[in-house]
Amino acid sequence: MKIAFNTLGCKLNYAETATYERGLMAAGWEVVPWTDVADVYLINTCAVTETAEKKSRNLIRRAHKTAPEARIVVTGCYAELRKEQLLALDGVWRVFGANEKSQIVNTLCHAERSEASVVTFGAYSSGEERTRAFLKVQDGCDNFCAYCTVPYARGRSRNIPICEVVKMARDIAAEGVKEVVLTGVNTGDFGRTSGESFLDLLKALNQVEGIERYRISSIEPNLITPEIVDWIASGTKFQRHFHIPLQSGSDRLLKRVGRRYDTALFASRIDYIRQAMERPGEPRVFFGIDVIVGLPGETEELFQETYTFLKERIRPAFIHVFPYSRRPGTRAAEWKDQVQDRIKTERVARLEALCEELHTAFVQAHKGLHETVLWESSQKEGRMGGYTGNYIRVERPFDAARVNQLEEIVL
């Protein structure tokens, strides 16, 4: 049987897709490009924005047009929130919600074609390419921020025990993968269901032989404790790379939407990490910051607070900018002071320009410094790429002998 995959949204979705891919390949399935004719198309959807939902529907229609007789399987956040809507689309065979994903591989391997139905989930490890793998350690969220559908789509915060995560990491290491990215909806909340701590997890993973690098895909600022920072800074496999959601640099907006920190706490966490991990003449910490533009009630003055906070106080290496999308069923969707789309677009452009300025400055500051690169297997126009420990992208002429190798270079 041939299967094609397409994934939208966050790294957690990509982690889960890679798990389905591994399971089906182990069962003898052939994975083909999305544009090929396949027996099954699996689409891992996103529902963070209206645009993401539209892209998911378009992918379903495209797959059905490419292979009208194929089975189309839909999972992800959109699948949890809009099951009946998806089942009504031509070609959709099954829809797997948030608590149903553990059945995907088994269902595809054993089920006969039948009427479309909603079937029900666990937690996984996963990987991509030959050099890097995503390892899912947590799922769900208990925060219920006013703008967000994720708690409804993925359920309450939960995790598997450390011993099971370590086993998956060892399996990944056995495949020769050298870098692992820890993923989750609220990764730092790990331990809620197992009575363990996120720091205990990091320490256990650090002992897995064969894995040379770890990254934490995203962690809430209030969950980055001094103990975690001090331990990472003490000389571990965890890299100087943090992806942290800010969402707004306005305390008024942070409080209104229900975030569990203010700008003072956020800045203090950034300061602590820098003080613990940065030294003169050494590579700096890469901070990737998430920001939502155009939250209800965001006046020009409040947007300027965000802009100034990022430019003058935080100065991250990268800003992930998202225009606010009004999601049905959330509190923020009912608020009357919605921001016009044209204003959101203009503010997104301003933050993207700031991102370009800050990222360029971050890279330039590393010229002449020594860093270690993990070279990737993909190539384009005779060149290969890789990332330094602090996530600077570098390239060189392709050399097959360097694939999946760590090499010290001068930037």
Language-model regions, residue ranges each:
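Proteins enriched for Cys/Gly/acidic motifs involved in redox and nucleic-acid/cofactor modification
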Residues: 1-189, 203, 227, 242, ...
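Short strand-connecting beta-turns/loops that link adjacent beta-strands
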Residues: 36-37, 142, 247-249, 379-381, ...
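Conserved SAM/AdoMet-binding glycine-rich loop
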Residues: 72-73, 81-82, 174-301
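Glycine-enriched alpha-helix->loop->beta-strand junction motifs that scaffold or abut catalytic
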Residues: 91, 233-240, 313-317
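Glycine-centered loop/turn positions within well-structured domains
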Residues: 102, 143, 188, 222, ...
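Conserved, mostly hydrophobic/aromatic
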Residues: 145, 182, 216, 244, ...
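Short acidic, glycine/proline-rich loop/turn micro-motifs
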Residues: 254-257, 331-335
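Terminal RNA-binding accessory module
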Residues: 323, 334-411
